[in-house]
Amino acid sequence: MGIFHTVDDNEIKSGENTDIYFVRTSDILALEGKNPVVTVEITAQNLPDEWGVFCGLDDALSLLEGLPVDVYAMPEGSIFYRGEPVIRISGHYRDFAKYETSLLGFICHASGIATSAAIIKACAAQRPVYSFGSRRQHPAISRMIERSAWVGGVDGASSTSAPAGIPLAGTMPHAFVMCFEKPLDAWLAFDRHAPGDVPRVMLCDTYCDEKREALDAAKAGASAVRLDTPSSRKGDMRQILEEVRWELDINGFPDVGIFLSGGLTADDILKYRDIVDAFGVGGSIANAQVIDFSLDIVEIEEKIYSKRGKKSGVKEVYEFDNGDHLLLPKGVTPPEDAKPMIKIFIKDGQILTKPDMQKSRARVLSSIENMI
């Protein structure tokens, strides 16, 4: 056991990290000599919004690799709707029952973050959005947070634990500015010593009026000014942004952008996107509501079954060129222009292909262009 209250990779991969009723279920089934061949599907009956982004498949495949099962799934980054299966597993039930806890945890959390990131990115209307929220969650999962946010469409992440291939983005904390006698001294020091490829985005609300500090920063060579004004401050944020933009423009700095952060929601993005050039979003992405996936048996020994409130039998999901989906029982012929979404990823425990993070993100971005 490590020094922090976290579960290690071996405990997850071995199935030791599970709910106790799966242990008891497997033990009793073994004593009764039962281990039926089943097919299960993972679906969400309720979503935080009208649609979700499927994420976390890479971890799910790593978890199930080596088990005597076949795994089918939507490609990571797929848009899904209520009741659509995102993963399907076939095998002897006891061979994978104890992995349900970790399996659902992987995709519930990652998909929730990716979905929130995608909604916020769609609201931003082509303006850059950066993930600033890893500090709002346990540090042990910061890499997962940044990866999921990236799949959801953000343009960069603040945490140095982000996977390779994700651009790191950040400006400066208020503490940095406060370590100098004046904000100007901090900005000039940043400009002198920060790597040349780091944008000169200067934090402009530490001590003084935002428009005054923004103008001073622009004169000092800022490429953009960042406002992180807390909601407790008196005044209207829209008015503050308009004043800053006005002063920058009228004083000859129309190319100096405005970077906004500080407790932003999707509604805030919609409200300010016409005047803000880039957004840093923390809790609304990192603390996103999880997707409430559940795993249910739909076939036992090739006979269709379901519990109450669920649709029995294996299902296929098809997508049309306009983004519409069609859910059909397996074996029913779809329209000619419908493309199957569910693909095989594991055959007899062997991974056939794993998600590519960049392709997953591209899939999301191509899907959300007209979603908001």
Segments from the language model and where they lie:
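Flexible, solvent-exposed loop/hinge segments and secondary-structure transition points
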Residues: 1-94
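A broad, low-specificity signal marking well-ordered, structured residues that form hydrophobic/aromatic
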Residues: 40, 69, 87, 130, ...
